[in-house]
From Swiss-Prot:
The gene is RpL36. It comes from Ixodes scapularis. It comes from the Eukaryota. One of its GO terms (biological process) is cytoplasmic translation. This is Large ribosomal subunit protein eL36. The lineage of its organism: Eukaryota, Metazoa, Ecdysozoa, Arthropoda, Chelicerata. Residues 13-34 are annotated as: Disordered.
Length: 110
């Protein structure tokens, strides 16, 4: 709404009021990771590595077969959205691996 004027008609009629600020409901937090959860998942990933379907999907991503990787992951996980999320996660892992390899190579040459 616009600026409040002292008019009896129109959108700006009535008293000037401030909106109440409510605390967000707990359901709004769904999907947000806590520090502990993120730590535990990272630890498990470090210890267990990747599942066989994730390794195959990463191989497909390495040779730029993104659509094929998505179809493959979608078949394994069940939904399109989960497939897209997993594909993005695995492509981020590949980028991180490339960065780590480049950094390691750079430090060895010095």
């Amino acid at each position: 709404m616009g600026v409040q004027y002292k008019l009896a008609v129109g959108l700006g009629k009535g008293h000037k009021v401030t909106k109440n600020e409510y605390k967000p409901r707990p359901s709004r937090r769904k999907g947000a990771l806590s520090k502990h959860t993120r730590f535990v998942r990272d630890l498990i990933r470090e210890v267990c590595g990747f599942a066989p379907f994730e390794r195959r999907a990463m191989e497909l991503l390495k040779v730029s077969k993104d659509k094929r990787a998505l179809k493959f992951i979608k078949k394994r996980l069940g939904t399109h959205l989960r497939g897209k999320r997993k594909r993005d996660e695995l492509s981020n892992v590949l980028v991180a691996q490339r960065k780590a390899a480049a950094h390691k190579e750079k430090t060895e040459h010095k």
